[in-house]
Amino acid sequence: MAKEKFSRTKPHVNVGTIGHVDHGKTTLTAAIATVLAAKFGGEAKAYDQIDAAPEEKARGITINTAHVEYETAARHYAHVDCPGHADYVKNMITGAAQMDGAILVCSAADGPMPQTREHILLARQVGVPYIIVFLNKCDMVDDAELLELVEMEVRELLDKYDFPGDDTPIIHGSAKLALEGDKGPLGEEAIMKLADALDNYIPLPERAVDGAFLMPVEDVFSISGRGTVVTGRIERGIIKVGEEIEIVGIADTQKTICTGVEMFRKLLDQGQAGDNVGILLRGTKREDVQRGQVLCKPGSIKPHTHFTGEIYVLSKDEGGRHTPFFNNYRPQFYFRTTDVTGAIELPEGKEMVMPGDNVSITVKLINPIAMEEGLRFAIREGGRTVGAGVVAKILA
């Protein structure tokens, strides 16, 4: 049979497995891919294919991540699984693999463990919007009351980090049984139930093109007789000729009008998410716009200087700092296209941060940046990346 070409007929959703080490994340990933491949087509993946995750780089940080694809009757999923705990932390903070929803794997035999808690907290901090729970290894627990107790603990933990514990789907099963071809309620049936929960509990993500127009400014040119052209890649939304836009960040917010959109030297009526374009601005001087600002739909994004963030600090081996840093450390924060200096305040009782740590911090920037919760940044010292982070909460 000829190899079928990839046809994107089903809507696409990004998910991933999270949870404590050895609770069965990779086994479950293999089980989902195998069971759904048999049902809806696609490629079954063996455990060792997933476990040997290739290295990739995101924001200057090396991360091991395995990518698996599978389909349900309604959707196409891209699923990420990480071999080690540090990879999860890095993955979630850098947004290397953005998740529309996560599958929290928790062993019924052990109940919630430290990384179970840490991954739920990380999911909350980095803005993973939905969690589904797979209570794994249920074949090892004979006591129904014990299962109920573990389920209750998981729901309480989700509640604690502002996920709707009572409404979260929790599926009981055994990834190992499912992978071995067991057709029973803990085997294949549990995987089908999980697939059903993915389809019904995780809403379709908003497509980038449907968002409010936003384009980070990469370069600014002055073209005689035509005015000022700003180039960059449109992050989301659509810009049409004649529309009003705002220039946000670094300086005071200004209003202007898009009088032209150019791509590959051709004039267009509009540009949309993903396009690399030049946007012509009416009445705006070349010195009024600079790299690091954004063009956006008026009122859709505001400039901020004060926020809390979740950061990962590169270890020495990863090319990071060799020494810890302390309260009031002042590196550069690289947002989208530019560096802004900021001061770091550590959480109470935290003396210092070692290379290789992840930590929640509060930051005050010297210049405002167009910012939303969930925005990613790199932390740099003289152009060298020493960490990565995500805006958890805007304070001012």
Swiss-Prot record:
Residues 60-64 are annotated as: G2. Residues 136-139 are annotated as: G4. Mg(2+) binds at T26. The keyword Electron transport does not apply. Residues 174-176 are annotated as: G5. It comes from the Bacteria. GTP binds at residues 19-26, 81-85, 136-139. Keywords: Cytoplasm, Elongation factor, GTP-binding, Hydrolase, Magnesium, Metal-binding, Nucleotide-binding, Protein biosynthesis. It is found in: Cytoplasm. Residues 19-26 are annotated as: G1. Its EC number is 3.6.5.3. Residues 81-84 are annotated as: G3. InterPro entries: EF-Tu_GTP-bd, EF-Tu_GTPase, EFTu-like_2, EFTU_2, G_TR_CS, P-loop_NTPase, Small_GTP-bd, T_Tr_GTP-bd_dom. Residues 10-206 form the tr-type G domain. One of its GO terms (molecular function) is GTPase activity. One of its GO terms (cellular component) is cytosol. It catalyses: GTP + H2O = GDP + phosphate + H(+). PANTHER family: ELONGATION FACTOR TU, MITOCHONDRIAL, ELONGATION FACTOR TU-RELATED. Monomer. GTP hydrolase that promotes the GTP-dependent binding of aminoacyl-tRNA to the A-site of ribosomes during protein biosynthesis. Belongs to the TRAFAC class translation factor GTPase superfamily. Classic translation factor GTPase family. EF-Tu/EF-1A subfamily. This is Elongation factor Tu. It comes from Polaromonas naphthalenivorans (strain CJ2). The lineage of its organism: Bacteria, Pseudomonadati, Pseudomonadota, Betaproteobacteria, Burkholderiales.
